[in-house]
Amino acid sequence: MEREVYKGQIVRVTEEIIEGINWERVYLPSGVIIFPINEKGQILMIEEKRPHENPPQRIKPVSGILELDKGTSEENAQREMQEEIGFKANHMEKFWTMKASGTVNNQQDFYIARGLIPSKLPNPDGEETILSIRAFDLEELREKFLNDEIRWSMSTLGFFRLYQHLKAI
């Protein structure tokens, strides 16, 4: 039987003995990851302050925790864009859902956002957390990931799916 050994604001950890082995599981919140594309065909990323990380800032896609009490996955994606970059999209395309299960468990919905129009909502994390909005050409962004100029994370898997998707169009 799975038993909870830790529950924080973001992370939950359980243990379960199966066939004499103690298996640990980490549950992370599900989320949305958005790749907004501007009128020049560039992908917008944010430079974000992260005081608990080393280094204390990072470049990443627009993203957030999926809060189903605040709407659908797509509505959450729109809200995250409004909070983090001050735009909403006329067209949202969910191009991938990544479901992780095993030791680390969560789900991420990945979106392409096009037809961006200004629409700012207050950022609940504080406006000062977003240091800048950066625009990258597809190949430039790919090179930055491959050269480790942008740190890899779960969202990097989504970028390479995006890359494959856009190259097929």
Language model features with spans:
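Acidic, metal-coordinating catalytic segment for phosphate/diphosphate chemistry
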Residues: 2-39
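Acidic pyrophosphate-coordinating catalytic loop
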Residues: 4-9, 54, 97-110
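Active-site-adjacent beta-strand/loop module that shapes the phosphate/pyrophosphate-binding cleft
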Residues: 14-20, 101-120
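Conserved Nudix-box catalytic region and its N-terminal flanking loop in Nudix hydrolases
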Residues: 28, 32-79, 127
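Conserved hydrophobic "DFG−1" position in protein kinase catalytic cores
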Residues: 36, 45, 112-113, 135
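Nudix hydrolase/Nudix homology domain
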Residues: 57, 103, 126-169
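The catalytic Nudix box helix
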Residues: 61-96, 111, 126-129, 137
